[in-house]
Amino acid sequence: MICRVWHGWTTLENADAYERLLESEVFTGIANRRIEGYRGIQLLRRAHDSEVEFVTMMWFTSLEAVRAFAGDDYTRAVVPPKAQSLLARYDQRSAHYDVREDQR
């Protein structure tokens, strides 16, 4: 199993709108692609003094499945234009981890 981890930050004012966009459009759009080997996504949120940090953790069965999602340059962040407009900054690259243990 591969976990794809990415970070983005919004202003305090844009945080709720960004989260709604993810849940209503972005995550649904990913699921609707029916990528073989895609196993879901988790969203983490943490408020800081002047911004809100979001972390996505996507789950795939293999790097081939990650490539089916992100393309050959699979570490490149996939951030739709609507999402970019609500973000103050974001990682240009995603990190990929081999899941060694999962007791969820």
List PLM regions with ranges.
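An amphipathic, aromatic/His-enriched active-site/gating alpha helix that lines ligand/cofactor pockets
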Residues: S24-E36, W59-A95
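Non-catalytic surface loops within mature trypsin-like serine protease
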Residues: L12, F60-S62, D98-E101
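Short, surface-exposed ligand-recognition loops at beta-strand->loop->(often short) alpha-helix junctions
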Residues: W9-L22
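Glycine-rich beta-strand-turn "strand-cap" elements at beta-sheet edges
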Residues: R39-V52, V78-R104
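Short, well-ordered beta-strand segments in beta-rich or mixed alpha/beta enzyme
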Residues: C3-W9, G40-Y74
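Exposed boundary/loop context
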Residues: M1, I30-R33, L44
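Intrinsically disordered, low-complexity acidic/polar segments
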Residues: A15-A17, A65-R67, Q103
